[in-house]
Amino acid sequence: MNVFLSKYVNGVDKKSRVSVPANYRAVLGKELFNGVIAYPSIRNNCIEVCGISHIEKLRQMIETLDPYSEERDAFETMIFGEAVQLSFDGEGRVILPQSLMKHAGIEEQACFVGKGVIFEIWQPQNFEKYLNAAQKIAHEKRLTLRNAH
């Protein structure tokens, strides 16, 4: 399967290392880079994480915007300027930069949340609050997911 699924909570050690779930690493196995790209979410107080191929798709979308627009500049700055390449160590861990941990409020635990083509890393209690709100929205908007066939 080529999508990020499920939710996992893993500990963050004193060196800011955290283990990326094995099935997430399996999804990334086809990427050219043995690691992930992480950047601060522009929607939530979490970290968005993806492979190089998804960053390329984001680049293509952003390049459709006027090259001198505020929107393009903001997206390039927030996604590309703040992005970091995180390599996997021999145990499947990455080192989370302090700037990203601060953005997400992560200290001792990290909650990995599969979102299809990306995954997010949250402070666990913050994710539970978001999940409660998302459940309400999904319930209210459930009819927008209609079968296209």
Curated annotation (Swiss-Prot):
Signal peptide: none annotated. SUPFAM superfamilies: AbrB/MazE/MraZ-like. Disulfide bonds: none annotated. Pfam families: MraZ. It comes from the Bacteria. One of its GO terms (cellular component) is nucleoid. One of its GO terms (biological process) is negative regulation of DNA-templated transcription initiation. Its main location: cytoplasm. Residues 7-54, 83-126 form the SpoVT-AbrB domain. Keywords: Cytoplasm, DNA-binding, Repeat, Transcription, Transcription regulation. InterPro entries: MraZ, MraZ_C, MraZ_dom, MraZ_N, MraZ_sf, SpoVT-AbrB_dom, SpoVT-AbrB_sf. GO terms for molecular function: DNA-binding transcription factor activity; transcription cis-regulatory region binding. It is found in: Cytoplasm, Nucleoid. The keyword Lyase does not apply. Belongs to the MraZ family. Forms oligomers. This is Transcriptional regulator MraZ. It comes from Rickettsia africae (strain ESF-5).
